[in-house]
């Protein structure tokens, strides 16, 4: 579960390395899970890239340490909390996605992120 002040690693090549959650988008929502959109501040970035430190960006959560229960009864969890930076059209800013992503992103219409990911769990 991601909440305000949570740090996430960035799983794409947009230039950011770490982001900090400012707000979970939605009507008065407290926690973000896989597939939710958050507003975040870039805390660590690579030089000469698309995003800079202290930029405010939108991102979609692709991995969480919290256990994710599926309707089939399976449960999965990842080793880190990670997000992919997106633009206003829900397309990723980067051209590559690193690491596995959850299958729930396809159901939430983030098909571009799913197609760029090396593995969908």
Curated annotation (Swiss-Prot):
Q: Name one GO biological process term.
A: translation
Concerning InterPro entries, the annotation shows:
Ribosomal_uL14 (IPR000218), Ribosomal_uL14_bac-type (IPR005745), Ribosomal_uL14_sf (IPR036853)
Gene Ontology molecular-function annotations: large ribosomal subunit rRNA binding; structural constituent of ribosome
User: Matching SMART domains, A to Z?
Assistant: Ribosomal_L14
Sorted keywords for this record are: Ribonucleoprotein, Ribosomal protein, RNA-binding, rRNA-binding
Q: Which Gene3D superfamilies match?
A: Ribosomal protein L14 (2.40.150.20)
**Top-level taxon:** Bacteria
GO CC, one annotated term: cytosolic large ribosomal subunit
Coiled-coil ranges per UniProt: none
Please state which protein family the record places this protein in: Belongs to the universal ribosomal protein uL14 family.
Describe the subunit structure. Part of the 50S ribosomal subunit. Forms a cluster with proteins L3 and L19. In the 70S ribosome, L14 and L19 interact and together make contacts with the 16S rRNA in bridges B5 and B8.
List the NCBIfam families hit by this protein, alphabetically: rplN_bact
The role this protein plays is:
Binds to 23S rRNA. Forms part of two intersubunit bridges in the 70S ribosome.
What is the protein's given name?
A: Large ribosomal subunit protein uL14
Q: Which organism is it from?
A: Synechococcus sp. (strain CC9902)
């Amino acid at each position: 579960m991601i909440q305000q002040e949570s740090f996430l690693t960035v799983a794409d090549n947009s230039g950011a390395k770490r982001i900090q959650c400012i707000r979970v988008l939605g009507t008065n929502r407290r926690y973000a899970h896989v597939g939710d959109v958050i507003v975040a501040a870039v805390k660590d970035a690579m030089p000469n890239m698309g995003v800079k430190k202290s930029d405010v960006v939108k991102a979609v959560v692709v991995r969480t340490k919290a256990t994710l229960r599926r309707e089939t009864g399976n449960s999965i969890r990842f080793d880190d909390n990670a997000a992919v930076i997106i633009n206003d059209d829900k397309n990723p800013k980067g051209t590559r996605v690193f690491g596995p992503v959850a299958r729930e992103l396809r159901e939430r219409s983030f098909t571009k992120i799913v197609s760029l990911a090396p593995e969908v769990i």
